[in-house]
């Protein structure tokens, strides 16, 4: 068998060409690698030792704003099951500081989100509102959570596939309230119906979960009666604050008479 020799100079030149080609291929691969962020959601109070993962959050919407507070992108997931292992992985290529606003609920369709347009809408123009009908809402609107986070991203085109972790501590903006009303001195008539009405103007929120301007509206719930003729009703109310003149009334639905009114 004859073995053909290769001149050393020729071999070195071929090897150099291969290395140059590999460098080019690697660079092209890196520039095309997916990059983005992994969103994580939890809830933890300042005194809490461990994070909680609210089962009420089954849907999330995340809005990303640049260093000028202008909307650059939006991400969502309608099949959320929060846990320590859950994450919403999104592709995002951006250099500079980003601020994220996350909203969560069992059903975000219960809320009206202001119109958003990428490259135009600012963070200060964001608002989220309860969907009302004739200035009324169900006594148990869907729970609502909000969370804020930020991150600074460098140019990562030559770093391959990188996903930064962004975590949201989700604050609930809804309150569960239970009312029990004892009749004094006479029991409530069994043949009459009663409702509890709460009037407030806490149905609209800005990007950081603060109450924004809103017309007054009513939460209304039918009061149930137990064997001792005590009236009971359960409410889920939006964020409550002192000094907002939140009024609660007990109304005889049969006669239309307002039996009791107080500032909640």
Language-model features, listed with the residues they occupy:
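C-terminal motif of bacterial Sec signal peptides marking the signal peptidase cleavage site
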Residues: 18-21
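Short consensus segments that form the blades of beta-propeller domains
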Residues: 50-54
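Tryptophan-paired
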Residues: 60-114, 189-264
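Bacterial N-terminal signal peptides that target proteins for export
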Residues: 1-10
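A sequence/structural signal for flexible, mid-protein segments enriched
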Residues: 130-229
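Bacterial signal peptide processing site
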Residues: 23-26
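Short, low-hydrophobicity acidic/polar segments
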Residues: 73-171
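A short, Gly/Thr-enriched small/hydrophobic beta-strand-prone motif that recurs across taxa
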Residues: 28-47, 170-182
